[in-house]
């Protein structure tokens, strides 16, 4: 079962109308955007953003930890209201409204030990290499749908990094703002980023289920998010999490 976090997001302001709806945000660990403290409470950039969105919009939010793939299924059925840190895909857009504007972007990149990443200069150099990736993630076209590549999916970024560190995989794809942060905290294996950099960024959104019973509140959240992005508040919140 998912764990509901009542710490930061569960403290509702007294001015909110009694009986007002509480929207459920489903997500999983993805440092530095979403991390777990020793008390199992979430913290990180996305949590700071959600806290400010709650304050600006007056909409109560509660956070529930759910594996990423299951979270997407809950968005598809309307069991969950929101997800944060979402990359856009055509398949997801069938059941998720991507609230505008996007609030952050990262660059996809390939990582491994020096001998593994040194030959990677172009996309074509990925042929014949086993590449680790996180299941249910979106990176860039044509990689995501390229059936000619030898791709090995795992459930989480943490597991993927450990497999590369231990030599079970020689190469992995990730997003720089997540993997660079992880490596800045610990990189005993000496993992490096390949020179080849895909040209398209991974743009991150707050998404609302099209089947949410609170779908009408989407524009209110989008307006609050837009104000945060345009004022530079999101950029300010992000600075402590940048390696």
Residue ranges and their predicted role:
Residues 69-81, 158-178, 185-186:
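Short helices/loops that flank or line small-molecule/ion binding pockets
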Residues 60, 138-148, 152, 190-191, ...:
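Ligand-binding clefts/hinges and TM-proximal coupling segments of bilobed small-molecule sensing domains
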Residues 60-67, 149-156, 160-163, 194-196:
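Short beta-strand-to-loop elements that line the ligand-binding cleft
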Residues 14-17:
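N-terminal signal peptide c-region/cleavage motif recognized by signal peptidases
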Residues 51, 63-125, 136-138, 192-199:
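Acidic, polar ligand-binding/catalytic clefts
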Residues 44-56, 117, 124, 129, ...:
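Extended ligand-binding regions for polar small-molecule ligands
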Residues 27-29, 105-108, 184-222:
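Periplasmic-binding protein-like
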Residues 20-95, 153:
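Extracytoplasmic small-molecule ligand-binding "clamshell" domains
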